[in-house]
Amino acid sequence: MKIIRVQDQIEGGKIAFTLLKDSLAKGAKTLGLATGSSPISFYQEMVKSPLDFSDLTSINLDEYVGLSVESDQSYDYFMRQNLFNGKPFKKNYLPNGLATDVEAEAKRYDQIIAEHPIDFQVLGIGRNGHIGFNEPGTSFEEETHVVDLQESTIEANSRFFTSIEDVPKQAISMGIASIMKSKMIVLLAFGQEKADAIKGMVFGPITEDLPASILQKHDHVIVIVDEAAASQLD
């Protein structure tokens, strides 16, 4: 696990984009993408670059259950607004949050991942150490699955909704085992509220109580953090 400290999120996005360019030069074809505030500066770098992504496939980590793609709180909407409208890909995959059978949708998504192995996976990290929507206690062997969101995650995401009651209580998420199959992982974290999770991920025991700790076992992880998020690493 390599740690890169940056001044701010803008610099973090630039460094992540440089890593992506290196990966593309080596033949990367499938990107694993995340939502939330952490990767936005990275997506901004992608959109303003002259690179053509029309031969690439993207696979997103997760989607809320119960939100249509037209909902401005859906991750499908987020990705279109922040990346896909500005930079078309060959194909973009996200879980279908309105699937009538969400368990079958999870299995369908695993098949997509099997057909498109992820070369470059972007991650954020939750305050409780979750990656994707893999909450503390999630089995490291889990593949794509339906998640009951913890109160801390619902509270953290409520800033994007009119009220906390509007935050969906479930999501479909790529599993930890799915994430670990990625050839390369770039995790972005900014702000003091992420410091505990970053410390646990880097130095703590590998435990399902802190899902991101499993990344210690991955062969190619780069963590990009500002000084606030890195404040407990010294």
UniProtKB/Swiss-Prot annotation:
Q: In the Enzyme Commission scheme, what number(s) does this protein have?
A: 3.5.99.6
Gene Ontology molecular function, alphabetical: glucosamine-6-phosphate deaminase activity; identical protein binding
Which top EC class applies here? hydrolase
Reactions listed under catalytic activity: alpha-D-glucosamine 6-phosphate + H2O = beta-D-fructose 6-phosphate + NH4(+)
A single GO BP term for this record reads: N-acetylneuraminate catabolic process
InterPro entries (alphabetical): Glc/Gal-6P_isomerase (IPR006148), Glucosamine6P_isomerase (IPR004547), Glucosamine6P_isomerase_CS (IPR018321), NagB/RpiA_transferase-like (IPR037171)
Q: Which GO terms describe its cellular component?
A: cytoplasm
Q: Which UniProt keywords apply?
A: Carbohydrate metabolism, Hydrolase
| Organism superkingdom | Bacteria
Keyword check for Hydrolase, yes or no.
yes
Q: Which Pfam families match?
A: Glucosamine_iso
Enumerate the active-site residues: 62 (proton acceptor), 128 (for ring-opening step), 130 (proton acceptor), 135 (for ring-opening step)
List, alphabetically, the Gene3D superfamilies matched: 3.40.50.1360
Q: Give the pathway listed in the UniProt entry for this protein.
A: Amino-sugar metabolism; N-acetylneuraminate degradation; D-fructose 6-phosphate from N-acetylneuraminate: step 5/5
Family statement drawn from the similarity comment of this UniProt entry = Belongs to the glucosamine/galactosamine-6-phosphate isomerase family. NagB subfamily.
Function, please? Catalyzes the reversible isomerization-deamination of glucosamine 6-phosphate (GlcN6P) to form fructose 6-phosphate (Fru6P) and ammonium ion.
Q: What is this protein called?
A: Glucosamine-6-phosphate deaminase
Its lineage reads: Bacteria, Bacillati, Bacillota, Bacilli, Lactobacillales
- Give me the gene this protein comes from: nagB
